[in-house]
Amino acid sequence: EDLTLEDLKIRIYNFIEKAKLAVNAIHFDFIIDPSIQNISFSSVEGMNIYRVVQEAVHNSIKYADATSIKVDFRKEQNYISIKIKDNGIGFDAKNVILGHGIFNMKKRINEVHGKLQIVSEPQTGTTVLIQIPNK
C-alpha cells in the first residue's frame, strides 16, 4: 500500500510535535513544496524516509545543541529532495566515527535507491540531504 506525502507529513509532524514537548527551546520549520503535495511513496520508501528524517531530527536534538531545525521537502529535476538542517555545533565529518544511526540512515536510503549526504563542520551546523528518485 502506498504512503502519500500527506501521510508522511502527518507522521513527521507528530514526531516533531512530540520532540517540541521534550525540548522547548528548539524552533522547528517543516516545509513541503506545494508542487509535490500529491506524490506518494511505496510503504517501504515512506517508512524508510520517515525513519531517516526521525533519526536526523533526533541527532540534532540529542547531539547538536541546536536552537533551530528545518525539514524541507522539494522537487528537484527527477528526484525528491529532503533536507534536514540544524544550526547546532556541527562536527568534523572527516574525523567523526559513524555510529549505528548514520550507518542505518545510509542503509535505509540505499534500499530505496536514493542518496544520502551529510554535510557538517564544527560551529556551522549539520545538513542531512536525502534524494529519492521521483517515479
Where are these regions (language model features)?
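Short, highly conserved beta-strand within the GHKL-type HATPase_c fold
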Residues: 79-83, 127-129
